[in-house]
Regions:
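Helix-loop-helix junctions that connect adjacent transmembrane segments
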Residues: 19-26, 62-63, 142-220, 244-370
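Membrane-helix boundary/coupling elements in multi-pass transport proteins
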Residues: 48, 112-130, 290, 295-308, ...
Length: 539
């Protein structure tokens, strides 16, 4: 009889982490590369897109919303750092759960991480496509709508374009991109007329296949394939590529902070608490729950544990340094954005770009577009790294077919087969699926992983207090009986999970049920830990 909660011995985990050779991952990443991977994973859509919606929920208090998110992620990050230093093995939260909560919980968290990494990469590839299309417009190049989005999004985009043109013609006095303009467009879209629908179909001009209109996000498909190829070639090359991209991205963010500060009017931040936070603490919390996506990705650093030169020292540095850097940059951009433009007038679709356009600095928008492209590219890179390393760890434990998911390329020393599979799936999903259908699942999957890692730290402090810990999560007293930091991590991230709504919970539960079918039909029969336990019982 299999023990569903059989834990993977820490001694076995540590010995596996020390294995080297042509069939194992190559250790080439130092603290700078790991920090760059963390920054690369985090800074992306959140800072270039979601800040606008966050501002309309919190006003200038958006700065505190980013601080709140940063604090919640720091609690989880400190727990990740303890595990990453103690268990330097690819797999991240999956490996940590295996050592503390048992095999079934480990499988659940590994399956859950697919929502964060693979679906996150698909979501970001779609967002990358939007900025790439804007980038091409700088050079006068336009891609047909049906090749720029999935069919549903392309039709929606065409309808929005028609509505915007109608508002421009009917109300030329309303500034394009202002809240009043967006409200007028939204009013038209509530009940689209037959004339609008016909004009949208004409604008879309999509070809038909077997009588069905085609929609295929070609840029999203191609960028996912390009990132996949880079990852197959090698982690060292991927790290160099990511470092270059992160340099560009951070430079653009610093440009926004330095150049944008010249246009800040302190009065836009308000004169008291009520004008600084027009919707109070509730508004700040609501914005924090929404912009949480802006912090997703730092945990991917721990999935590269077997490729770090000195994981016990470098992984905590990479995790904590990347979180600190990103939080500072986010708060700074929020301050500049809400200082440049009154929060009521901040553009929702492209807030930073339009903030400069409002001050007649149009050339800056081109620079920001380049920064957004760089940001989203590095996010995709790190998310795909994270997914492939989790699958590698699960296959090494026998929970997935090892010959495929743990196959290491003899030349590049990367898990090339599962990288190609994950990249293809991410490319296909990102090219044919509306971004809103997959994006909301990413947050809840990530938050579940954070909660379980915080809980696992508490459990391991009590069950294995003498295990060497090169880095210790602070704020844990009396052998784990008073876990202040992990406890706050559970409460903070659990609250954010609660705020995501019932349908996200339903989708998460359905996804986990599918995973349980896979576990009981295949994984439990091939588990390395279960086989070792059976041998021990036989003796």
């Amino acid at each position: 009889m299999a023990n569903l909660f059989k834990r993977k011995p820490l001694s076995l985990i540590v010995s596996e982490a020390q294995e080297e050779g042509e069939h194992h991952l190559e250790r080439v990443l130092g603290p700078v590369s790991l920090t760059a991977l963390g920054v690369g994973a985090v800074i992306g859509a959140g800072i270039f897109v979601m800040a606008g919606l966050g501002a309309h929920r919190a006003g200038p208090g958006l700065m505190l919303s980013f601080v709140l998110c940063g604090i919640g992620c720091t609690f989880a990050g400190l727990c990740y750092a303890e595990f990453a230093a103690m268990i330097p093995l690819a797999g991240s939260a999956y490996t940590y759960a295996y050592a503390t909560l048992g095999e079934l919980f480990a499988w659940i968290i590994g399956w859950d991480l697919t929502l964060e990494y693979a679906m996150g990469a698909s979501t970001v590839s779609s967002g990358w496509s939007n900025y790439f299309i804007e980038f091409l417009k700088i050079f006068g190049i336009k891609i047909p709508l049906w090749l720029s989005y999935d069919h549903w999004t392309a039709l929606t985009q065409a309808t929005h374009t028609v509505a915007r043109e109608m508002v421009v013609r009917a109300h030329p006095e309303i500034p394009v991109g202002s809240q009043g303009f967006l409200d007028a467009v939204a009013a038209l879209l509530v009940h689209p007329t037959a004339q609008m629908s016909s004009a949208a179909d004409t604008l879309l001009a999509a070809p038909r296949l077997f009588g069905v209109e085609i929609g295929f996000n070609l840029p999203a498909f191609l960028i996912a394939l390009l990132i996949t190829w880079i990852l197959v070639v090698g982690i060292k090359e991927s790290a160099r590529f990511n470092a270059a991209i992160v340099t560009v991205k951070v430079s653009v963010v610093l440009f926004v902070l330095i150049f944008g500060s010249h246009y800040v009017h302190v009065s836009n931040w308000g004169t008291d608490w009520h004008t600084f936070a027009p919707f109070g603490v509730a508004g700040i919390s609501s914005a924090a729950a929404y912009i949480f996506f802006a912090f997703i990705g730092f945990d991917a650093v721990s999935t590269t544990a077997q490729e770090a030169k000195n994981p016990q020292r470098d992984l905590p540095i990479g995790i904590i340094a990347s979180l600190f850097i990103c939080t500072i940059l986010y708060v700074g951009v929020a301050a500049v954005l809400t200082g440049m433009v009154p929060w009521q007038l901040i553009n929702i679709e492209a807030p930073i770009t339009h903030a400069f356009l409002d001050h007649n600095v149009g050339w800056a928008s081109d620079i920001i577009t380049c920064g957004a492209l760089a940001g989203l590219t590095s996010v995709m890179l790190v998310m795909l790294i994270g997914q492939t390393r989790v699958l590698y760890a699960m296959a090494s434990d026998g929970l997935l077919p090892k010959k495929f998911f743990a196959a290491i390329h003899p030349k590049f020393r990367t898990p090339w087969k599962n990288t190609i599979l994950v990249g293809l799936l991410a490319a296909i999903v990102g090219s044919i699926t509306p971004i809103d259908k997959i994006g909301t699942m990413v947050n809840i999957g990530t938050l579940l992983a954070f909660v379980m890692v915080c809980a696992a730290v508490i459990i391991l402090r009590r069950t294995n207090p003498n295990q060497p810990r090169p880095f210790r999560t602070p704020g844990i007293y009396f052998g784990g009986r008073l876990p202040i930091v992990p406890g706050l991590g559970i409460l903070t991230n659990g609250y954010l999970m609660y705020s995501l709504g019932i349908w996200n919970w339903v989708r998460l539960i359905v996804w986990l049920i599918i995973g349980l079918f896979v576990y009981f039909l295949y994984s439990i029969k091939h588990s390395k830990v279960q086989k070792l336990a059976n041998v021990a019982e036989g003796d």
